Amino acid sequence: MDSWAGHEVPRLPGRGGPLMLFDSARQGVAASTPTGTGTMYVCGITPYDATHLGHAATMITFDLVQRVWRDAGLDVTYVQNVTDIDDPLLERAARDGEDWKVLAMRETALFREDMVALRIIPPAHYVGAVESIPDIAERVLTLVKEEAAYRIDDGTGDVYFDISAAPRFGYESNLGREQMLKIFPERGGDPDRAGKRDPLDPLLWRSARADEPSWPGGGLGPGRPGWHIECAVIALNLLGHRIDVQGGGNDLIFPHHECSAAHAELLTGQSPFAQHYVHAGMIGLAGEKMSKSRGNLVFVSRLRADRVDPMAVRLALMSGHYRSDRSWNDDLLVTAQKRLDRWRRAAAAPSGPSARTFLAAFRERLADDLDSPGALTLADSWADAALVGTGDDQAAPALFARAVDALLGVRL
């Protein structure tokens, strides 16, 4: 599957420092220390209702990770998937009387357009679940042979992962069993499925049904993969046995990232699967959770159609810390547009305060668990000073613009 078009990222003088990131598994901030190349896997969209602001906020978060890594002198191999076959996609297509493949292709294309507009650095590998099915089926068979997976004895042939085979199950989410049992059905799990060894066992392979798409599965028979194993296999195949960052929204902490880690670790015999499990907060609207069921999603494409500057959208989403659940409202966008206008005027000023001093502090803020609110405040201070004629560094405005572009992804 093709990714989207990238843009040139300006080079800055010197190098940034190591990136400190909050790890959901360790419940604390720790240094991200890739050796030479940073590897990152981010769970992408299920292609319907794209791209809402929750998607955008998550993608901006991991775009910042890429930018800080690159500024520190690292190469980056970034993989993102598209869950282009899943129950919610099929349900939406059936509801709207549309071919699921047409729906998936259209929404994926729209997502790419939005990523270009938001100046998200594209992944090195943008991979659909469908194109990965042969590899996924092979890995599921491996789990069956190693007795870490089993078939339900009800005639369907469905295959489930046995969580008792994963002794560290629960380390990524830090949830107790009762919490898991509560969340599991809310996020795609089926704890009441008869024949499972444990209510929390996740689906690995759904055997073919007469009214559903299916693909050859070798020894599994025809069918389609479960959600969690898709991401585990794509990441393993493209990034290796251990990765530096596994990322997504905080609604993926459990069961998705917990189960993906368990699958990967059983397949490789190595733990932890990721050095950092990094999760972005949810975006609400006017104090309410933004969700498909409430019909209150705000879409990047609609904002663009209303001629909202995508850089203002990006700034608005970065005005809150990536880990916090936060609310979207019109005032945020108005404030972001005013900030963008002010920065653009400052970047066109004849001179300003030392941008190298600004750059050092700017890098420090972003390296501290992606403190974008702190970075925005620093940029505001520099811009305000430049606009009132403080400082005589004639090269400073251009370096300010390059720094904001390279590290925040905001083009002035």
Swiss-Prot record:
It catalyses: 1D-myo-inositol 2-amino-2-deoxy-alpha-D-glucopyranoside + L-cysteine + ATP = 1D-myo-inositol 2-(L-cysteinylamino)-2-deoxy-alpha-D-glucopyranoside + AMP + diphosphate + H(+). Its EC number is 6.3.1.13. GO terms for biological process: cysteinyl-tRNA aminoacylation; mycothiol biosynthetic process. Its cofactor is Zn(2+). InterPro entries: Cys-tRNA/MSH_ligase (IPR024909), Mycothiol_ligase_MshC (IPR017812), Rossmann-like_a/b/a_fold (IPR014729), tRNA-synt_1_cat_dom (IPR032678). Zn(2+) binds at C43, C231, H256. Binds 1 zinc ion per subunit. A motif ('ERGGDP' region) lies at residues 186-191. PANTHER family: CYSTEINE--TRNA LIGASE, CYTOPLASMIC, CYSTEINYL-TRNA SYNTHETASE. NCBIfam families: mycothiol_MshC. Monomer. This is L-cysteine:1D-myo-inositol 2-amino-2-deoxy-alpha-D-glucopyranoside ligase. It comes from Salinispora arenicola (strain CNS-205). The lineage of its organism: Bacteria, Bacillati, Actinomycetota, Actinomycetes, Micromonosporales. The gene is mshC.
